[in-house]
């Protein structure tokens, strides 16, 4: 599973301080969007341990989804997936045996720490009616899966 990186710097006496790059975009969870971190950790682990086949079983982002006119135009989530899928591709090109990638999550759901407040899904769920609507990110993910090629971001 990979969602973001965390970088800490020592500040003396065994204390540490979390370092955050404010120039990066952030998710609704307050996490940096840093796809290069996924490439970096895969390459580092493969160099150190010679990894067996790898499956990325969870990768996704809670974003500020707005349901309007029967649609959710979540371009920030599309960009998140494009960046992270490219990161996986980059690691594979450099020798990591990656066999699978799974977006988190198919549908907006109950998150153990956030309840229904944060939406990770590529399918929007109206919690009152249970109506489901495929988000723009769901359509983009479908297109990637069917073509096995990343669309270039605008």
At which residue positions do the language-model features occur?
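Non-catalytic scaffold segments within catalytic domains of secreted glycoside hydrolases
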Residues: 1-154
């Amino acid at each position: 599973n990979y969602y973001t990186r965390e970088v800490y710097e020592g500040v003396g006496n065994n204390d540490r301080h979390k370092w955050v790059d404010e120039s990066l975009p952030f998710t609704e969870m307050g996490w940096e969007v840093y796809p290069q971190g996924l490439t970096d950790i895969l390459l580092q682990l493969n160099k150190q341990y010679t990894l067996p086949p790898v499956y990325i079983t969870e990768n996704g982002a809670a974003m500020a989804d707005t349901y309007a006119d029967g649609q959710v135009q979540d371009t920030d989530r599309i960009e998140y997936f494009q960046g992270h899928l490219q990161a996986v591709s980059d690691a594979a090109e450099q020798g990591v045996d990656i066999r699978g990638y799974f977006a988190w999550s198919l549908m907006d759901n109950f998150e153990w720490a956030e309840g229904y407040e944060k939406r990770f899904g590529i399918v929007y769920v109206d919690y009152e009616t249970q109506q489901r609507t495929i988000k723009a990110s769901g359509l983009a993910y479908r297109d990637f899966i069917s073509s096995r090629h990343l669309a270039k971001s605008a």
